[in-house]
């Protein structure tokens, strides 16, 4: 008869799962599907649990004797349990020195085990409170970050407004308004018969050329102003 196969307590290497989820397997539909959701019961650390179990089960439902009353102060009970563990540990050391093979050694070990179970149970009852406090702290951090972001944005906005005001204050007084310089009035065409006269057409061309020269001069002034603003630190 062959030797029994040794089973490792550790999970298998993840590589044997990773190699199943290649791009080719996913495209061809050969990748393993995820396990279905558990509906009834499951095993964890060698114990069976139900999906509808309470997050913190009462001690009585686990077959454990309750050492503290139903209504109690968690801090006081934890201090009492801590002191009881210390005293029982010293008693266990005394038993191991005087009579290591005594039955009292097993009894004291069971007492210590029961005390530690109660300590862990009382600590676990603080988990919902811990979750609420963690959520509260996280929301406070997010609120503070948003307020700091809004404050920085407000400072940048005030700085931009100040820069614009300084630029406007540094403009020369003789600079024409940009609105008057950039806007070209659309004059209606004269449909009178006299508009076909050569002399009148020449006069219109001269006036339009004069206006064009004025617009070019204003555009050049604006370009110089923009270049000066860009050269400033």
Swiss-Prot record:
Q: Position(s) of the covalent cross-link Glycyl lysine isopeptide (Lys-Gly) (interchain with G-Cter in SUMO1)?
A: 185
One record GO biological process: positive regulation of transcription elongation by RNA polymerase II
Q: Which InterPro entries match?
A: Immune_Mod/Transcr_Coactivator (IPR051669), Med7/Med21-like (IPR037212), Mediatior_Med7 (IPR009244), Mediatior_Med7_sf (IPR044888)
Q: Sorted alphabetically, which Gene3D superfamilies does this protein's record hold?
A: 6.10.140.200
Give the span(s) annotated as Disordered.
Answer: 187-214
Superkingdom field: Eukaryota
Q: Where does the record place Basic and acidic residues bias?
A: 203-214
Compartments where found: Nucleus
| GO terms for MF | transcription coregulator activity; ubiquitin protein ligase activity
Q: Which residues carry this modification: Phosphoserine?
A: 195
> Which UniProt keywords are present, listed alphabetically?
Activator, Isopeptide bond, Nucleus, Phosphoprotein, Transcription, Transcription regulation, Ubl conjugation
Glycyl lysine isopeptide (Lys-Gly) (interchain with G-Cter in SUMO2) crosslink location in chain: 185
**What Pfam families is this protein classified in?**
Med7
Q: Name one GO cellular component term.
A: core mediator complex
The entry describes its oligomerization and partners as: Component of the Mediator complex, which is composed of MED1, MED4, MED6, MED7, MED8, MED9, MED10, MED11, MED12, MED13, MED13L, MED14, MED15, MED16, MED17, MED18, MED19, MED20, MED21, MED22, MED23, MED24, MED25, MED26, MED27, MED29, MED30, MED31, CCNC, CDK8 and CDC2L6/CDK11. The MED12, MED13, CCNC and CDK8 subunits form a distinct module termed the CDK8 module. Mediator containing the CDK8 module is less active than Mediator lacking this module in supporting transcriptional activation.
The entry sums up its family as follows: Belongs to the Mediator complex subunit 7 family.
Q: What does this protein do?
A: Component of the Mediator complex, a coactivator involved in the regulated transcription of nearly all RNA polymerase II-dependent genes. Mediator functions as a bridge to convey information from gene-specific regulatory proteins to the basal RNA polymerase II transcription machinery. Mediator is recruited to promoters by direct interactions with regulatory proteins and serves as a scaffold for the assembly of a functional preinitiation complex with RNA polymerase II and the general transcription factors.
PANTHER family found in the cross-reference section: MEDIATOR OF RNA POLYMERASE II TRANSCRIPTION SUBUNIT 7, T-CELL IMMUNOGLOBULIN AND MUCIN DOMAIN CONTAINING TIM
- Please state what the protein is called: Mediator of RNA polymerase II transcription subunit 7
Look up and give the organism this protein is from.
Answer: Mus musculus (Mouse)
